[in-house]
Design a protein with these regions (language model features):
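Entry/capping segment at the start of metal-dependent catalytic domains
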Residues: 4-110
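C-terminal solvent-exposed extensions
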Residues: 49, 76-81, 267, 271-336
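Extracytoplasmic
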Residues: 61-64, 96-101, 110-113, 118, ...
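Second-shell loop/turn segments in exported
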Residues: 89-93, 131-139, 154-159, 225-234, ...
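Soluble non-cytosolic domains of exported or imported proteins
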Residues: 94-98, 128-129, 136-144, 162-166, ...
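Extracytoplasmic/secreted envelope proteins and their assembly/folding machinery
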Residues: 98-100, 115, 131, 142-150, ...
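Amphipathic, coiled-coil-like alpha-helical scaffolding segments used for oligomerization/assembly
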Residues: 134-198, 284-287
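Flexible, polar/acidic helix-loop-strand segments at domain edges
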Residues: 173-255, 336
């Protein structure tokens, strides 16, 4: 491991390979688990984005859609942290950008929850700003991101939950690390991920963030480093692997000791931003399927393209069925 980061701890018992058919990023979903038992005092400490009040869709029918955003921002980051240089950027206001965007579709009547990750390179029409990557919409404010998704993809968004990377690391630290298995030696020289030997390890908060953010993921096999050419799409899959492990650990800890739930919430609450209309206690009823493990992942069909000299992703031929399901106008499509 790099000397600037505490090393991952080798686990004595090898875990089975983690199933990839799970849900998005850990910092958002662990916050959702925490909301299930949120207290009034903790709710008062949550930041409210007032600009979202006029753009969120009214809830209709038995389902609710939550936009879950993981933001890459230096606003709450510690300048002395070993990964500070990789968070945000010096040429953006506040070094702020969306790193992960997902939609959680919860049907309280059926007791089911579904997740869809939106690639940040998805080419969309940003109202008032023209066409660009989805990631660019967030730089104009969370209300523009919400408006973009609703108008470009036709999916009503009822609520907004955003957590930054400081909160991510706090949650992983509160969990005591997260267990992840690697089939080969693995690295990402851009994020600092460094796993020199295959096996299962408990990743600390720094290596966990490096793993979850990795877009230039390499494995060492057949005497050479082999890069994962899927970039953002590969990163989405790895985030889902990481999340399953983190959720499992959080559920185990909070089941054995309910006080751990409050500790996990406190680890995230100061870096949590939600829409003005979100009642955390009311939302708990809709988010219970996360805690019970009943979450199904639906991949969004996309294909690479070159537009305005930019490498982007555009919707694929099979995207319509998934978008219609999340919009509430059709039933769930089959998962391949």
């Amino acid at each position: 491991m790099s000397s600037s980061r505490p090393p991952a701890r080798r686990r004595r018992k090898i875990l089975p390979q983690i199933n990839t058919l799970t849900v998005g990023v850990v910092f958002v979903a662990l916050t959702a688990i925490g909301l299930v038992v949120a207290t009034k005092q903790q709710e008062a400490n949550v930041n409210r984005a007032d600009a979202l009040g006029g753009v969120m869709a009214d809830k209709s029918g038995p389902f609710a859609n939550y936009l879950l955003v993981g933001s890459d921002t230096r606003e709450t980051a510690d300048p002395n942290s070993p990964d500070y240089g990789g968070i945000g950027s010096t040429n953006e206001a506040g070094g702020r950008r969306s790193d992960t965007v997902m939609i959680l579709h919860v049907d309280n009547e059926l007791g089911t929850a579904s997740m869809m990750s939106l690639p940040r390179d998805l080419w969309v029409d940003i109202p008032g700003f023209g066409k660009d990557r989805l990631n660019s919409a967030y730089s104009h404010g969370p209300e523009v991101l919400v408006d973009t998704i609703q108008t470009s993809l036709g999916i009503p968004l009822n609520h907004y939950i955003e957590v930054d990377f400081t909160s991510f690391k706090n949650i992983v630290s509160a969990l005591g690390g997260v267990d992840v298995c690697f089939e080969y030696p693995t690295r990402d020289i851009n994020t600092g991920l460094n796993v020199p030997t295959p096996g299962c390890f408990t990743l600390d908060q720094y290596q966990s963030l490096a793993y979850a953010r990795s877009r230039y993921y390499e494995v060492f096999r057949e005497d050479a480093w082999d890069v994962d050419g899927r970039a953002d799409l590969g990163r989405i899959e790895r985030q889902q692997i990481f999340l399953q492990a983190a959720i499992s650990k959080a559920i185990q800890q909070t089941t054995a000791n309910p006080m751990r739930t409050s500790e996990l919430i406190n680890a995230a609450v100061n870096s949590l931003t939600v829409d003005p209309g979100l009642n955390l206690l009311e939302a708990a009823d809709y988010l219970r399927p996360l805690a019970s493990g009943g979450v199904k992942r639906y991949p969004l069909s996309v294909v690479p393209d070159m537009i305005d000299d930019k490498e982007v992703l555009v919707l694929g031929a099979e995207a319509g069925a998934v978008l219609a399901y999340f919009a509430g106008t059709a039933g769930p499509p089959p998962v391949g």
